[in-house]
């Protein structure tokens, strides 16, 4: 509202909704997921590990740490920027910040795992990077629109696919989310995370490295 102080949470929310943070995360995820394959490191240790698929879990843990540090660092950095620009520091509602931050953290991590799976399955950094970046852009709304149209032609009305996708949840999560909205977002994030880790592990286990 006019006359109100701009809080750190206001700017963080705007950047998060615009997928500013997730863009950096997915680029790193693609590069990190295939770095050890390209360097030959996996070939050296692959024979020593009975279940190579378990190496995906170590990647996912590393990406989880990176995601947490990136999101937390971005929030604190925004606080410093607000203080420099506005000569004062107002964080915003602690309850809203906590619920929104944790929910977005889960959603961002799920999208990072999706990009990890894409990179591992395709084994092509260029194509994987293009797909990852497209996931963070409005181009996905075109895909969602086509899916919605196809579903409506099947007789199912009022169906919106973006309500069940990670990118959709990232964009739709309100500034002061309710408990149900957070639970729904966490549910979508968990489902995608489990599927992506399982798919990546299965492919990595069977692939000739």
Language model features with spans:
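Perimembrane helix-loop junctions in membrane proteins
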Residues: 39, 82, 86-90, 148-152, ...
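Transmembrane helix segments
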Residues: 125-162
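Short loop-to-helix capping motifs
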Residues: 50-51, 123-125
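Small-residue-rich transmembrane alpha-helices that serve as helix-helix interface/gating elements
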Residues: 162-167, 186-195
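Secretory targeting signals
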Residues: 1-32, 56-123, 132, 137-141, ...
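Junction motif at the cytosolic side of a transmembrane helix
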Residues: 191-209
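Transmembrane helix boundary and interhelical loop/hinge segments in multi-pass membrane proteins
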Residues: 29-53, 60
